[in-house]
Amino acid sequence: MAKDLQVLTALDVAKTQLYHFTAIVIAGMGFFTDAYDLFCISLVTKLLGRIYYHHEGALKPGSLPPNVAAAVNGVAFCGTLAGQLFFGWLGDKLGRKKVYGMTLMLMVICSIASGLSFGHTPKSVMATLCFFRFWLGFGIGGDYPLSATIMSEYANKKTRGAFIAAVFAMQGFGILAGGMVAIIVSAAFKNQFPAPAYKDGALASTISQADFVWRIIVMFGAIPTALTYYWRMKMPETARYTALVAKNLKQATNDMSKVLQVEIEPEQEKVEEISQGNDFGLFTKQFLRRHGLHLLGTASTWFLLDIAFYSQNLFQKDIFSAIGWIPPAETMNALEEVYRIARAQTLIALCSTVPGYWFTVAFIDKIGRFAIQLMGFFFMTVFMFALAIPYTHWTHKDNRIGFVIMYSLTFFFANFGPNATTFVVPAEIFPARLRSTCHGISAAAGKAGAMVGAFGFLYAAQSTDPKKTDAGYPAGIGVRNSLIVLGCVNFLGMLFTLLVPESKGKSLEEMSRENEGEDENGTEMRASGRTVPV
């Protein structure tokens, strides 16, 4: 059976080597682009409003209408969700490596095309941008299940969690790169082409060269991704796919002998034994009996986490304005606004978002996925309620720094918590022939939650007083009530975490139970040791 295969045992016990770190960089570049893209578009939406939606004589600079802003920011989410489902399924059908190249090329081409969006009217430019951002998201979506699956199937038992989490943590570098590129490009153009503040010269405050600024920022994300294409194509197919799905033990042994630089026996006679009792499909009775609750656990926790995680971005504008990092829009020119927004968001990322990722990498194989996820949801719940219940206290000028610290801590415990573990666990607990598909389903549930968080709460967080809402938005339930709802969402995440098994220190075959067969009566032979914490 699978547990007897020397090639898989060799991978499980292999010492940490150069190929592990090479795999992290190659797989992580997709997440670098993912974070860069989602982050950089939020830096340039204000600029897009000034360029394409300027109204003569208006007291404030132009801004994207709510429906256009939602489309520009949200269309990539829709593409990502579709890509996660499609490429997740395709990765199990055709193999990880074949599909991996497709997703990367799609990301590179659509990143560049997004920056070349054209049209005679503002509406046509935004429509072209949205079209290419959907397909960019589609490619990024494919990277989620494939990168996680490839890293989990290459890693050893001892440090597998840290390696998969490190791939995901490349998002942190993508966020920082997005901020730094926006700062450098906007500063360079600002110095070269001085312009007055909006209140001193409405039309002159947005220079014609500003149109190049957002295009350069959007396109830059394609460069590091394109550089890894060669190495992606050089990676051999994972041994677990070749042996357990394609049933080609000889090829798997040859590939891993080169990678690990050790002699491994082919064991071709075990091919039939591998699949005995492990040929059930997705959503069959046997799948639901073995993995149904696990899939519910991974999908629901990712869904709930992303509602809370992506809705937190809604409060950034209030925070930045409150602490004076971003002055009123009319007191700045277009490029000054890009510079200020990029600087503020990069500082928040540097102080709270990025450290959280690497705390997970450091501790995931020491204290386990289950403990980190439960702890993360717990502290996110605590901090959300701590912000919500005395909300009027935090709005006073003297308490604003405290509000920023509390806000930063929710981001920290999202990343040193469920934001990382919801990505890691689905790559470890499902059978090889369904691993990529199940990870894609879990990730797609997460993106559905992201859409609820980013857009549902964009409307919900509006003031209950119609006179105080943002332009174009109806009255909502207010920020305080929104924070209370988000606290409840995080608490639900804690409860659904109880469905997620602990995979620390176990092989993929132990977790997926591919090292079990069926006896002559067709009943399952269960491996010793429970997987679900109680």
Curated annotation (Swiss-Prot):
Protein name: Low affinity inorganic phosphate transporter 1
The protein's role, per its UniProt record: Low-affinity transporter for external inorganic phosphate (Pi). Involved in phosphorus (P) remobilization from dying to developing tissues during corolla senescence in an ethylene-dependent manner.
CC terms in the record's Gene Ontology section: plasma membrane
Membrane topology: Multi-pass membrane protein
Domain of life: Eukaryota
Note: Although related to the sugar transporter family, it does not transport sugars.
Membrane-spanning residues: 24-44, 70-90, 99-119, 125-145, 164-184, 211-231, 291-311, 344-364, 370-390, 401-421, 441-461, 482-502
UniProt entry keywords in alphabetical sequence: Cell membrane, Ethylene signaling pathway, Membrane, Phosphate transport, Symport, Transmembrane, Transmembrane helix, Transport
InterPro entries: MFS_dom (IPR020846), MFS_sugar_transport-like (IPR005828), MFS_trans_sf (IPR036259), Phos_permease (IPR004738)
Predominant place of localization: membrane
Reactions catalysed: phosphate(in) + H(+)(in) = phosphate(out) + H(+)(out)
Ranges in the topological domain labelled Extracellular: 45-69, 120-124, 185-210, 312-343, 391-400, 462-481
PANTHER family to which the protein is assigned, alphabetical: SOLUTE CARRIER FAMILY 22 MEMBER (PTHR24064)
Topological region Cytoplasmic: 1-23, 91-98, 146-163, 232-290, 365-369, 422-440, 503-534
Record region (Disordered): 507-534
Key word NADP present: no
Induction: By ethylene during corolla senescence.
Family: Belongs to the major facilitator superfamily. Phosphate:H(+) symporter (TC 2.A.1.9) family.
GO molecular function, one term: symporter activity
PROSITE patterns, per database record: MFS
Annotated compartments: Cell membrane
Keyword Transmembrane: yes
